[in-house]
């Protein structure tokens, strides 16, 4: 049996561009791809922290050091410039590998530059938690 496990995650990246008319994918700064051990064409889930949207696509490399996180194609209807997102890649592995595997968790600053790289999936990097996202259903009183 294979288990599907978290392989890598880029946590709380800021979307820098959204291009509805591009053919698809997400453009990611090559430095972030390297830090997260993501390959061009690799499948990722994108979770939008601002609005709760979740989608799947594949990555294409962006200019190294640019901080680019570009949402391309139809996904630009769901994820917008300035939104905070989490990019997640999963891997399939056998039971023994899954029990020993350490994911790559990349924390970035507001300019999408790496500030922490570890395997801890439960702790935010210092100073990155930010203000809570407002609940649109909450009573404004």
Swiss-Prot record:
<keyword id="KW-0068">Autocatalytic cleavage</keyword>
<dbReference type="GO" id="GO:0006523">
    <property type="term" value="P:alanine biosynthetic process"/>
</dbReference>
<feature type="active site" description="Schiff-base intermediate with substrate; via pyruvic acid">
    <location>
        <position position="25"/>
    </location>
</feature>
<keyword id="KW-0210">Decarboxylase</keyword>
<dbReference type="InterPro" id="IPR003190">
    <property type="entry name" value="Asp_decarbox"/>
</dbReference>
<feature type="active site" description="Proton donor">
    <location>
        <position position="58"/>
    </location>
</feature>
<keyword id="KW-0456">Lyase</keyword>
<keyword id="KW-0670">Pyruvate</keyword>
<comment type="similarity">
    <text>Belongs to the PanD family.</text>
</comment>
<feature type="modified residue" description="Pyruvic acid (Ser)">
    <location>
        <position position="25"/>
    </location>
</feature>
<dbReference type="Pfam" id="PF02261">
    <property type="entry name" value="Asp_decarbox"/>
</dbReference>
<comment type="pathway">
    <text>Cofactor biosynthesis; (R)-pantothenate biosynthesis; beta-alanine from L-aspartate: step 1/1.</text>
</comment>
<feature type="binding site">
    <location>
        <position position="57"/>
    </location>
    <ligand>
        <name>substrate</name>
    </ligand>
</feature>
<dbReference type="GO" id="GO:0004068">
    <property type="term" value="F:aspartate 1-decarboxylase activity"/>
</dbReference>
<keyword id="KW-0865">Zymogen</keyword>
<comment type="function">
    <text>Catalyzes the pyruvoyl-dependent decarboxylation of aspartate to produce beta-alanine.</text>
</comment>
<dbReference type="GO" id="GO:0015940">
    <property type="term" value="P:pantothenate biosynthetic process"/>
</dbReference>
<protein>
    <recommendedName>
        <fullName>Aspartate 1-decarboxylase</fullName>
        <ecNumber>4.1.1.11</ecNumber>
    </recommendedName>
</protein>
<comment type="subunit">
    <text>Heterooctamer of four alpha and four beta subunits.</text>
</comment>
<dbReference type="InterPro" id="IPR009010">
    <property type="entry name" value="Asp_de-COase-like_dom_sf"/>
</dbReference>
<keyword id="KW-0566">Pantothenate biosynthesis</keyword>
<keyword id="KW-0704">Schiff base</keyword>
<dbReference type="GO" id="GO:0005829">
    <property type="term" value="C:cytosol"/>
</dbReference>
<feature type="binding site">
    <location>
        <begin position="73"/>
        <end position="75"/>
    </location>
    <ligand>
        <name>substrate</name>
    </ligand>
</feature>
<keyword id="KW-0963">Cytoplasm</keyword>
């Amino acid at each position: 049996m294979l288990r599907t496990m978290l392989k890598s995650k880029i946590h709380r990246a800021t979307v820098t561009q959204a291009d509805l008319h591009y053919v698809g994918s997400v453009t990611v700064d090559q430095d972030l791809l390297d830090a997260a051990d993501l390959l061009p064409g690799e499948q990722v889930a994108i979770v939008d922290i601002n609005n709760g949207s979740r989608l799947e696509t594949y990555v294409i490399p962006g200019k190294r050091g640019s901080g680019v996180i570009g949402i391309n194609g139809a996904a630009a209807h769901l994820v917008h410039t300035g939104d905070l997102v989490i990019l997640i890649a999963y891997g399939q592995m056998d039971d023994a590998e899954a029990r020993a595997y350490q994911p790559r968790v990349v924390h970035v600053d507001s300019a999408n530059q790496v500030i922490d790289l570890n395997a801890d999936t439960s702790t935010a990097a210092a100073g990155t938690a930010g203000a809570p996202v407002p609940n649109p259903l909450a009573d404004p009183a």
